[in-house]
């Protein structure tokens, strides 16, 4: 099973990177592949509570690849890191199958809280260059995070997110409209004038009522 997964990781490189030309080249020169293999070993040790040895392997891998994956992170099959330099994946991160990330991506936490504090990335997601996905949030199945985006909230399935902070611009193949009907927005100044006008009318009515009572006396 383990060796079949390693072979699958190599095949994933050929599927994702048109620049890959031979098994020899991929095995010896792809730092993303090296980082994934090192993580698979470190994670197996981590699950067996060999924490120090797992962290040691993780740190050696980081030194040689420029990719930091905590051994506690759970990563599925056919995970692909393209270019890789600067990728950081936190301890409680959960990554599904067929996920792709590019250089400079951070799947990190937002504080010092304990427990689940890193993102969950579902199957077939893609996270582009320099994107930051932070906190215990979920990036939905088949979703895409644009380059340089900062995502702090859950992303629905089959969505595209861009910007800082990240916002959904496409969902289920359809553009998400942003409400720019400024004429329909509330006008606080006009609302205040209407309130004052109503108070004046009420005061006039009260004065008229008192005048009538005085005249009757």
UniProtKB/Swiss-Prot annotation:
Gene3D superfamilies: Hexapeptide repeat proteins, serine acetyltransferase, domain 1. Keywords: Acyltransferase, Amino-acid biosynthesis, Cysteine biosynthesis, Cytoplasm, Repeat, Transferase. Its EC number is 2.3.1.30. InterPro entries: Hexapep (IPR001451), Hexapep_transf_CS (IPR018357), LbH_SAT (IPR045304), Ser_AcTrfase_N_sf (IPR042122), Ser_O-AcTrfase (IPR005881), Serine_acetyltransferase (IPR053376), Trimer_LpxA-like_sf (IPR011004). SUPFAM superfamilies: Trimeric LpxA-like enzymes. PROSITE patterns: HEXAPEP_TRANSFERASES. One of its GO terms (molecular function) is serine O-acetyltransferase activity. Pathway: Amino-acid biosynthesis; L-cysteine biosynthesis; L-cysteine from L-serine: step 1/2. It catalyses: L-serine + acetyl-CoA = O-acetyl-L-serine + CoA. One of its GO terms (cellular component) is cytosol. Belongs to the transferase hexapeptide repeat family. This is Serine acetyltransferase.
């Amino acid at each position: 099973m383990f060796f079949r997964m390693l072979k699958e990781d190599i095949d994933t490189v050929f599927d994702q990177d048109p620049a890959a030309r031979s098994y020899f080249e991929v095995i010896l020169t792809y730092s993303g592949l090296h980082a994934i293999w090192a993580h698979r070993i470190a994670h197996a040790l981590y699950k067996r509570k060999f924490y120090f040895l797992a962290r040691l392997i993780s740190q050696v891998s980081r030194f040689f690849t420029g990719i930091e994956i905590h051994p506690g992170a759970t990563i599925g099959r056919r995970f692909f890191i393209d270019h890789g330099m600067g990728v950081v994946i936190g301890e409680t991160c959960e990554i599904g199958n067929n996920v792709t990330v590019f250089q400079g991506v951070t799947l990190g936490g937002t504080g010092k809280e304990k427990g689940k504090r890193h993102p969950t990335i579902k199957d077939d997601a893609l996270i582009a260059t320099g994107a930051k996905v932070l906190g215990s949030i979920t990036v939905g199945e088949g979703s895409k995070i644009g380059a340089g985006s900062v995502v702090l909230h859950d992303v629905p399935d089959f969505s595209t997110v861009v910007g800082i902070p990240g916002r959904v611009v496409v969902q289920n193949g359809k553009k998400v409209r942003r409400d720019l009907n400024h004429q329909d927005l509330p006008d606080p100044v006009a609302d205040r004038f209407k309130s004052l006008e109503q108070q004046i009318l009420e005061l006039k009515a009260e004065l008229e009522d008192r005048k009538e009572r005085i005249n009757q006396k």
